[in-house]
């Protein structure tokens, strides 16, 4: 690859947080460069449509540049924006959302919401660590390096709660000992709840008795009563291992008086504090009237369903996995809102107009899909089953933009949109959008409803 150093002005950031410039008419994405900066860079990868490069010198520094706090930042793939000030990170994500909506969806929000800010350090309540062994059987524990599958061995992480970060070296030591005895962990992960922190370790095969004893001894010397070790064997379901405890892995939504038990492997938001703010905003956006029938699509464990029910709605949560549906029902009973909720197992990626009709009409709808979005759902919505309001929570601005374009074509107005800084120091963007059914579309609905 080229060793020559080129110099250019940076015009923008791409969706990964890389600086963008053009050289000889060809776009170049430069890691470590910011808009308005003049940088020296070296090409590291050439492609037909664009080149990728790394900044090697900065001749004009942006006011938005800051010093990364983590010593692993240059190599670790866990973060990509530590060199950008927190306020500039939020502004970048806001611009990215607006640009995607306009470019992909051909839509523009009537109102841009103020961002939801969260903590910028030590905010992660769960994380999975990769594990690898080198030829000398030395174990690495950490996150994968940028653009590769190599594991960056870390002894601390600025995004983790300090009590977890402080234990990384001890966890590595345990996994090293087990590897030398013949049991190499596939991965290790932690989950922090309101009562307890769980260390979940996955192995390809069942541990021997001496290895289990080694974990118990290690726990007693390294961890405290606020922890518990779980094991996942042969790709099965994780199970509590040591010690026995009455404490439950759960998170809380205090505004709604909700406790949400969960298990390792369940999807939960990684940032509990920002999740609380997000749930509160979404419930306010829905403007719930008592007795309204509201759908919660991709409902998971009921993160939105239960607060909506507590706010007076009759909620139907729809989720693809039967086990999650069962757990959502349990959570509803636990929180005293099972009479206001119903949960259905359905593959929303196979959604059709017939599927939508089978649900009957909802007054309002919440959509909270994975990164791939909810295209099959939004394209299947049709009169007379169009809800008056849709709130769409997204972790991928490009699929939000695509689906927003479909909803506007179906007679909705994109009333509001904004971001929530759920993933500080990374380029991942959590956003929310509100779609209101236009009056003319509503009249069409009323006419058809009257004929029925």
Swiss-Prot record:
The keyword Transport does not apply. Keywords: 4Fe-4S, Iron, Iron-sulfur, Metal-binding, Methyltransferase, rRNA processing, S-adenosyl-L-methionine, Transferase. Residues 1-57 form the TRAM domain. Its EC number is 2.1.1.190. The active site is at 395 (nucleophile). GO terms for biological process: rRNA base methylation. One of its GO terms (molecular function) is 4 iron, 4 sulfur cluster binding. This is 23S rRNA (uracil(1939)-C(5))-methyltransferase RlmD. Catalyzes the formation of 5-methyl-uridine at position 1939 (m5U1939) in 23S rRNA. [4Fe-4S] cluster binds at residues 70, 76, 79, 157. Signal peptide: none annotated. It is an enzyme of class 2 (transferase). CDD domains: AdoMet_MTases. Pfam families: tRNA_U5-meth_tr.
């Amino acid at each position: 690859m080229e060793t020559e150093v080129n110099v250019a002005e940076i015009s923008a950031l791409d969706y990964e947080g890389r600086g963008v410039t053009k050289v000889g008419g060809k776009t170049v994405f430069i890691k470590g460069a910011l808009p308005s900066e003049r940088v020296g860079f070296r090409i590291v990868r050439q492609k037909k449509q664009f080149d990728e490069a790394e900044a090697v010198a900065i001749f004009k520094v942006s006011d938005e540049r800051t010093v990364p706090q983590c010593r692993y930042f240059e190599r670790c793939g866990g973060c990509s924006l530590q060199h950008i000030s927190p306020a500039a990170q939020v502004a970048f994500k806001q611009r990215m959302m607006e640009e995607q909506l306009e470019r992909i969806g051909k839509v523009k929000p009537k109102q841009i919401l103020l961002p939801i800010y969260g903590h910028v350090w030590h905010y992660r309540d769960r994380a999975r660590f990769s594990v690898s062994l080198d030829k000398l059987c030395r174990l690495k524990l950490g996150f994968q390096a940028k653009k590769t599958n190599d594991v960056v061995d870390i002894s601390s992480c600025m995004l983790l709660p300090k009590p977890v970060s402080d234990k990384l070296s001890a966890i590595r030591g345990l996994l090293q000992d087990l590897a030398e005895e013949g049991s190499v962990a596939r991965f290790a992960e932690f989950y922090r709840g309101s009562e307890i922190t769980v260390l979940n370790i996955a192995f390809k095969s069942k541990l021997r008795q001496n290895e289990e004893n080694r974990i118990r001894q290690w726990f007693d010397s390294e961890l405290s009563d606020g922890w518990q070790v779980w094991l996942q064997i042969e790709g099965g379901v994780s199970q509590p291992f040591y010690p026995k405890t009455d404490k439950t892995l759960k998170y809380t939504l205090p505004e709604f008086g909700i406790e949400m038990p969960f298990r390792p492997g369940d999807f939960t938001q990684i940032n509990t504090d920002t999740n609380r703010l997000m749930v509160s905003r979404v419930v306010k956006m829905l403007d719930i009237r008592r007795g309204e029938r509201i759908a919660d699509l991709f409902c998971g464990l009921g993160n939105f369903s239960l607060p909506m029910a507590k706010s007076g709605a009759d909620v139907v949560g729809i989720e693809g996995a039967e086990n999650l549906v069962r757990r959502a029902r349990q959570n509803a009973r636990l929180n005293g809102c099972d009479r206001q909720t119903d949960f259905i197992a359905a593959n929303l990626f196979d959604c059709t107009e017939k599927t939508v009709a089978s649900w009957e009409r909802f007054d309002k709808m919440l959509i909270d899909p994975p990164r791939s979005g909810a295209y099959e759902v939004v394209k299947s919505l049709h009169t007379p089953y169009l809800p008056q309001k849709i709130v769409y929570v997204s972790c991928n601005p490009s699929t939000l933009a695509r689906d927003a374009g479909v909803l506007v074509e179906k007679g909705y107005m994109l009333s509001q949109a904004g971001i929530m800084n759920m993933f500080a120091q990374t380029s991942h963007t959590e956003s929310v959008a509100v779609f209101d059914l236009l009056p003319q579309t509503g009249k069409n609905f009323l006419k058809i409803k009257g004929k029925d």
